[in-house]
Amino acid sequence: GDVYGGGSPTVIAFYENGIMEDRFGGYVISCEPARNVLFGYHPKTAGAGITLPQRDIFLTSNPEKNFAGADFARAGKINGLINLFRPSDVCIGPDGAIYVADWFDARVGGHGTRDMGQTGAIYRIAPKETKLSIPRVSINTIAGQIEALQNPSPNVRELGRSRLEKA
């Protein structure tokens, strides 16, 4: 794992293939809302386990690390959207893009929810000039099920895998 001090990691996604640059192949993306960041890792095998030898900043609204609204940053003050980027979920879409759910809450940790409007955003991360499309896959045939196994989205791959298992 990765020990970096106070925070509130919420979810990870494994980016295997898709439309992003090759350097993101095999990349683990971790949401950290208290630190306003998505961390990225290239896991390495170590015997029967794995290590995360280097932490990258994949995406952040707060490069100056002016943390506020987290249990470990009691003195910090919310500074607009810099501190309100709270990535709470990440997944890989069937189009190969990375999708990030962001919750605009002034507080993270404990039970101090302050977002009475329940506001947020979903961001799609993809190279600028990429034309995004969702491939049509028929999971009703064995050929389609095998094709689904090659999709960047683990959800689509699971559909193909579960149907193949029943075949």
PLM feature spans:
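Beta-propeller domains with acidic blade repeats across secreted/periplasmic ectodomains
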Residues: G1-Q145, N155-K166
